[in-house]
């Protein structure tokens, strides 16, 4: 994803963009997010529906799907693919998104977002206390779950093509084969 401006931007600059603009503010840089592929959307839909059934329907929290702004600090406003906020979370839901670190963030990577999802955003999610970070790669059919511990993000569950991954926060297993079919 090409950077549009070199000058460090802030939330004030970001909020001047028209609603629905396909950008994220990553470490003070305005980054364009191209529309995801059909398969990306299929994977996202399947994960969202599993989470919706297990969280929202049971009144254990909220699940949001992109585009949805997550305000972490003055230079970082992200639009993760899926955001989970559990019932007792300390994040603040506001009209334009949320302020603070959600309990779980899920990124479904694509060639244009991989660098940001795997490095830049991952570092910021870790710093601000996202409890679990799920990285799903539809191309390689891998699904990784990281838990934020005193040592930072540590991989706690991983599967490729087949198998189960388990969220410790949700005590939920997901069948990877069903997600990628």
PLM features: what roles do these ranges have?
Residues 1-181:
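Gly/Pro/Ser/Thr-rich low-complexity, intrinsically disordered segments predominantly at protein N-termini
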């Amino acid at each position: 994803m090409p950077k549009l401006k070199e000058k460090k931007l802030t939330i004030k600059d970001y909020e001047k963009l028209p609603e629905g603009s396909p950008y994220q503010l990553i470490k003070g840089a305005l980054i364009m997010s191209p529309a995801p592929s059909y398969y990306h959307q299929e994977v996202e839909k399947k994960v969202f529906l599993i989470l919706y059934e297990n969280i929202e329907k049971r009144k254990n929290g909220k699940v949001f799907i992109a585009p949805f702004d997550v305000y972490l600090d003055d230079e970082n406003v992200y639009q993760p693919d899926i955001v989970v906020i559990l019932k007792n979370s300390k994040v603040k839901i506001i009209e334009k998104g949320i302020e603070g670190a959600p309990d779980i963030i899920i990124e479904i990577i694509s060639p244009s977002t991989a660098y940001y999802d795997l490095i830049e955003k991952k570092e910021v999610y870790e710093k601000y206390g996202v409890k679990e970070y799920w990285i799903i790669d539809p191309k390689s059919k891998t699904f990784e779950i990281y838990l934020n511990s005193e040592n930072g993000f540590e991989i706690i569950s991983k599967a490729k093509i087949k198998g189960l991954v388990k969220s410790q926060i949700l005590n939920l297993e997901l069948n990877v084969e069903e997600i990628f079919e």
